[in-house]
Amino acid sequence: MKHFEVNFDGLVGPTHNYAGLSYGNVASQNNAKEASNPKEAAKQGLRKMKALTELGMTQGVLAPQERPDLATLRRLGFTGNDASVLAQAAKQAPAVLAACYSASSMWTANAATVSPSADTQDGRIHFTPANLTNKFHRSLEPEVTGRILRAVFNNDRHFYHHQHLPENDHFGDEGAANHTRLCRAYGESGVELFVYGRSAFDVSQPAPKRYPARQTLEASQAIARLHGLGDESAVFIQQNPDVIDQGVFHNDVIAVGNQNVLFFHQQAFLNTASALAEVRTKFGDGELHFIEVPTAEVSVQDAVKSYLFNTQILTLPSGEMAIIAPTECRDNPAVSAYLTKLVTLGTPIKGVHYMDVKQSMRNGGGPACLRLRVAMNDTELAAVNPACLITDSQFARLDGWVDRHYRDSLALDDLRDPALVMESRTALDELTQILKLGSVYPFQR
């Protein structure tokens, strides 16, 4: 039986825009109110997916959410037909309208937390959609995220789908962006690292002062319980509050892991030595590489600006590892110099591939934000909805679909246009047929 990791990337939705909705996400705030290019954003994402298949990887795709979320606008008191709801919201609450138009579901690292069958008590892959309570625009996602995941992983024998955690900041959960897994091989049991920003029920614990800690210890513990992870399979590590206050809003902005490699910044964690000692103990026998990037070589500011740690580390079919990095890493002198050195250090990472995902980067999401990792075996892969796996023909279908339905410019003023609602629904209705998802969207039900 073969074992591997499959990346399921989020397809950028037709309403991709720069509204600066994410407080604590420096790039999102810095690019607020610029015009976006939804067509180019979607194509950049698709090209990244296609590039990974060309490296020999199995690559999946997850559909975007229906936006605007008119049901939420109506729940907030805007009435009448769709055009009337948009006009009222644009006039009375433009920030709320922008939030209900957000295409943030493209960052599928926040879609869910996934535990592979090698780690779970019942031998199934477990999924829990993230509740994303900390940001209003993202808190609208979990219900439909769950539907999409069930349509992609639609086999009770191999996949177990949980409801998202209670919708309260005490159990604030941001999904796989604060979770990584270390293992000797994908098919062997591993150690799942849950990184949290604060404890909700013990306010004596350290917490950031400037920006919010979006993930709580209690949420991470609940996910581990739901997924049936034993004590030997889970490590809970607090993120350094000081780096959250410097714009590190998720752990995947300051650390990333794959198999027996943990790649992280010197300032990433609060009690680094004890945390890594626990990881090493629970990892057990076998080579384990901790690659710590010193502040003297790459500052936190450069790490955030370039998204050095929001890269993907892939194990290629050859067995060597490679980093998928945004072109911003190549353009940053300190980060570029570090990556050039990294591939010579004798770790499993032997190459770096740069990819252009600028439309996503300007909204605060790099290559790792755009993907949800699922470690699986070939039997489990055979149970995945095949229309949600990228092949040459499916790539061509999706690329053509983007050409037919997406605008090449979207400004905040355009969000009041009722035609955008129909364009988006027409596009998504066709997409559910291409991806064979069934009726996952509210307008289809």
UniProtKB/Swiss-Prot annotation:
What Pfam families does the record tag this protein with? AstB (PF04996)
Q: Is-annotated flag, keyword tRNA processing?
A: no
- Tell me the InterPro entries matching this sequence: AstB_sf, SuccinylArg_d-Hdrlase_AstB
Which residues does the annotation say bind substrate? Answer: 19-28, 110, 137-138, 214, 252, 363
List its EC numbers.
3.5.3.23
- Annotated metabolic or biological route of this protein: Amino-acid degradation; L-arginine degradation via AST pathway; L-glutamate and succinate from L-arginine: step 2/5
Gene Ontology terms: biological process:
arginine catabolic process to glutamate; arginine catabolic process to succinate
* Residue numbers annotated as active site: E174, H250, C369 (nucleophile)
Hydrolase as UniProt keyword: yes
Query: Which key words are in the record?
Result: Arginine metabolism, Hydrolase
What reactions does this protein catalyze? N(2)-succinyl-L-arginine + 2 H2O + 2 H(+) = N(2)-succinyl-L-ornithine + 2 NH4(+) + CO2
The broad enzyme category this protein falls into is hydrolase
GO molecular function terms listed in the Swiss-Prot or TrEMBL record: N-succinylarginine dihydrolase activity
The similarity annotation says: Belongs to the succinylarginine dihydrolase family.
**Role of this protein:** Catalyzes the hydrolysis of N(2)-succinylarginine into N(2)-succinylornithine, ammonia and CO(2).
What do we know about how this protein assembles, alone or with others?
Homodimer.
Q: What is this protein called?
A: N-succinylarginine dihydrolase
Q: Which organism is it from?
A: Aeromonas hydrophila subsp. hydrophila (strain ATCC 7966 / DSM 30187 / BCRC 13018 / CCUG 14551 / JCM 1027 / KCTC 2358 / NCIMB 9240 / NCTC 8049)
